[in-house]
């Protein structure tokens, strides 16, 4: 099953997340099909905290991809800000 979820990056105590489309059987930070955005929870000042390619996300959802709980909240926030 294809899912849209967060893959963690960054350093220890300084998380940075990629929003990726992946097979649900793959590891959290493992192989993915497509990168559709990022989320920086500790962004400060002028730094961009969230960027999502909503067109590609809607494309994958249309093909039957499931969305993780946290990513669904991020999508809702991105649509509200746009």
Swiss-Prot record:
Keyword Cell membrane carried by entry: no
Gene Ontology terms describing biological process: translation
Name used for this protein in its record: Small ribosomal subunit protein bS16
Superkingdom to which the source organism belongs: Bacteria
Keyword S-adenosyl-L-methionine assigned: no
Record-level Gene Ontology MF annotations: structural constituent of ribosome
Organism of provenance: Yersinia pestis
InterPro entries for the chain: Ribosomal_bS16 (IPR000307), Ribosomal_bS16_CS (IPR020592), Ribosomal_bS16_dom_sf (IPR023803)
Database matches in Gene3D superfamilies: 3.30.1320.10
A Pfam match: Ribosomal_S16
HAMAP family the UniProt entry points to: Ribosomal_bS16 (MF_00385)
Keywords: Ribonucleoprotein, Ribosomal protein
Similarity section: Belongs to the bacterial ribosomal protein bS16 family.
GO cellular component entries: cytoplasm; small ribosomal subunit
């Amino acid at each position: 099953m294809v899912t849209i979820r967060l893959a963690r990056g960054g350093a220890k105590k300084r998380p940075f997340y990629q929003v990726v489309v992946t097979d649900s059987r793959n590891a959290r930070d493992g192989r993915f099909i497509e990168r559709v955005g990022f989320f920086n929870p500790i962004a400060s000042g002028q730094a961009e905290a969230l960027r999502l390619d909503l067109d590609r996300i809607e494309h994958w959802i249309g093909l039957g991809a499931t969305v993780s709980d946290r990513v669904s909240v991020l999508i809702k926030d991105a649509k509200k800000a746009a």
